[in-house]
């Protein structure tokens, strides 16, 4: 596994723990179809949450939410429609979140959770 893949997996693990600690139930991780992948699908109360996770090892690449705009956000919405087609009876409320996981050089980890990011 490449360094970038390990960093991404680390970030998704941290994000899933963060969501669980916040009271969410993780329904799927790395859900795939032919059109792409959704990092995390969770249920938080009556809300179904589709999560994109961006992991950064520094500030060189900007913030996570800044990376999920335009085509990327539209692709995640399309993937959510596919997920919903395969999983009937979703909750009435659907939300798209971006979780940014920052792994600092000194080993500390910070999570920024932007609810309803797009």
From Swiss-Prot:
Tell me the disulfide pairings in this chain: none
In terms of InterPro entries, this protein maps to:
Restrct_endonuc-II-like, tRNA_endonuc-like_dom_sf, UPF0102_YraN-like
Pfam families documented for this protein? UPF0102
MF-aspect GO terms: nucleic acid binding
Say which family it is in.
Belongs to the UPF0102 family.
Under NCBIfam families, the record lists: PRK12497.1-3, PRK12497.3-3, YraN family protein
| HAMAP family in UniProt | UPF0102 (MF_00048)
**Name of this chain's protein:** UPF0102 protein Franean1_1156
Organism of derivation: Parafrankia sp. (strain EAN1pec)
